[in-house]
Design a protein with these regions (language model features):
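Entry/capping segment at the start of metal-dependent catalytic domains
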Residues: 1-43
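N-terminal start-of-chain detector that recognizes signal peptides
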Residues: 5-11, 24-26, 50, 72-73, ...
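Metal-dependent phosphoesterase core characteristic of DEDDh/y 3'-5' exonuclease domains
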Residues: 30-35, 39-70, 91-177
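Metal-dependent phosphoesterase signature
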Residues: 65-86
């Protein structure tokens, strides 16, 4: 079995964007704009990586806070592929026998929302684990939430050359933890 450590970046609607809810016909936290993942083998060794920009369908213009946080531009998104294609590539890359992991539940929840939005089969929670809770429990015997930055510092893992809030970088940080 492989372990797929994934991270997502997503655009969000402005709070007063009622037309967004009319277009989606459902409440939505945000629209995925980048998928990043690291594949680990059964020995927890990194064997591959995946990254792809997703061209948004419902939120075509970057929210100013998301743009500032991620550095993702409209030009990056214009080079992306539609969500259905991006997710299909991601699934093919994952293979057949794998467990998904993410830092906290936000990424799996936004993925499930976007799968529902695009009428694709949802992820089963049995095939996902919360790396943040695993870290917290094994390191401190608690379920307290710790940031990736805290865990990296705690475990003395260097992140100097990579920036946070890039889906591939964040997945790599989590894989190292």
């Amino acid at each position: 079995m492989n372990y797929i450590v994934f991270d997502l970046e997503w655009n969000q609607p402005y709070s007063n964007d009622i037309s967004f809810m009319k277009r989606t016909k459902m409440p939505l936290t945000g629209e995925i704009i980048q998928i990043g993942a690291i594949k680990l083998n059964e020995n927890l060794e990194i064997v591959d990586s995946f990254t792809m920009y997703v061209k948004p369908k419902y939120l075509p213009h970057m929210h100013k806070h998301v743009k500032a946080l991620t550095g993702i531009t409209n030009q990056d998104l214009n080079r992306g592929v539609p969500f259905r294609a991006a997710y299909s590539h991601f699934q093919q890359w994952c293979g057949k026998d794998y467990m998904l992991l993410s830092w906290g539940a936000d990424d799996i929840l936004i993925l499930r929302e976007n799968l529902l939005l695009h009428k694709l089969k949802s992820i089963d929670y049995d095939s996902w684990a919360d790396a943040q809770m695993i870290y917290s429990f094994h390191r401190y015997g608690t379920t307290q939430q710790y940031s990736v930055a805290h865990a990296m510092e705690d475990l003395q893992i260097s992140t100097e050359e990579l920036s946070a809030h890039n889906a591939l970088h964040d997945a790599l940080f989590t894989a190292h933890i």
